[in-house]
Amino acid sequence: MEENLERTESLAREADDCHPIFRIAPSTVEFNKLRKRLLRHIRQAFDDFSMLSSGKKWLVALSGGKDSYGLLALLLDLKWRGLLPVEILACNLDQGQPGFPKHILPDFLNSYQIPHRIEYQDTYSIVTDKLVHTQTYCSLCSRLRRGNLYRIAREEGCSALVLGHHRDDVLETFFMNLFHGGRLAAMPGKLINDEGDLFVLRPLVYAAEEDMEKFSQAMQFPIIPCNLCGSQDGLQRNAMKEMLKDIERKMPGRKDTMIRALTNVRPSHLLDKKFFDFKNLF
């Protein structure tokens, strides 16, 4: 009894040391372990991809989904603890989707005094005008969104755009490229855009989607569903997601093994002559 009381008091003290966004988080051992695990994954990505050398001001994309909310909260936590020496600017791009609740994100960000910018660009009409209803919108929508986020990052003097893609997104993209694109490619933890003036960072590349889902529910984020792409059936990414779920169900731990494989590439054991000089192999 006394030991449990001490543990509860310890968790309460630790909660007081967190960013204000965590003040409604549960004071439980389970949540504390989850938060620490996610922070550990992020710090590992920082180290593996030298993310902290990516400038002093980051634009963190906030869609209103579980992953971007979670990423923002965890980055703010690290900054609060003095472990992330960068300025953070949250940014939501309102793409003109019908029924998009315009008040939710500003209210959320203002309630915690989080620096932010809300930008309106009607890319929804562009996507629906250019594509017939049988085509998937995700690719074009993503390109338009990314272009606008690059512009905003430049206008705000940011050196990096930070995105909320997690481990499962990386694996789904890898298999989409493998099955449908005929190439070995996934999502890097860090890259430079085509213009060469902005970094793109993905601090959640080692974080499991399941953990992000649990974290989001515990934090009670006001989630905004994607009415544009979520209403379409038969998307390739959904098929990859279900395939990976089935693999993980039958062989637990395979997703982590796959991520390790993406960090352990042997060009000499593949068939791409651009990356290994087979001709001069004697």
Swiss-Prot record:
A motif (PP-loop motif) lies at residues 63-68. CDD domains: TtcA-like. Keywords: 4Fe-4S, ATP-binding, Cytoplasm, Iron, Iron-sulfur, Magnesium, Metal-binding, Nucleotide-binding, RNA-binding, Transferase, tRNA processing, tRNA-binding. It catalyses: cytidine(32) in tRNA + S-sulfanyl-L-cysteinyl-[cysteine desulfurase] + AH2 + ATP = 2-thiocytidine(32) in tRNA + L-cysteinyl-[cysteine desulfurase] + A + AMP + diphosphate + H(+). Its EC number is 2.8.1.-. Binds 1 [4Fe-4S] cluster per subunit. The cluster is chelated by three Cys residues, the fourth Fe has a free coordination site that may bind a sulfur atom transferred from the persulfide of IscS. SUPFAM superfamilies: Adenine nucleotide alpha hydrolases-like. One of its GO terms (cellular component) is cytoplasm. It is an enzyme of class 2 (transferase). Its main location: cytoplasm. [4Fe-4S] cluster binds at residues 138, 141, 229. One of its GO terms (molecular function) is magnesium ion binding. Pathway: tRNA modification. InterPro entries: Rossmann-like_a/b/a_fold, TilS/TtcA_N, tRNA_Cyd_32_2_STrfase, tRNA_thiolation_TtcA_Ctu1. GO terms for biological process: tRNA thio-modification. Its cofactor is Mg(2+); [4Fe-4S] cluster. It holds the Pfam family ATP_bind_3. NCBIfam families: PRK10696.1. Belongs to the TtcA family. Homodimer. PANTHER family: AMINOTRAN_5 DOMAIN-CONTAINING PROTEIN (PTHR43686:SF1), SULFURTRANSFERASE-RELATED (PTHR43686). Catalyzes the ATP-dependent 2-thiolation of cytidine in position 32 of tRNA, to form 2-thiocytidine (s(2)C32). The sulfur atoms are provided by the cysteine/cysteine desulfurase (IscS) system. This is tRNA-cytidine(32) 2-sulfurtransferase. The gene is ttcA.
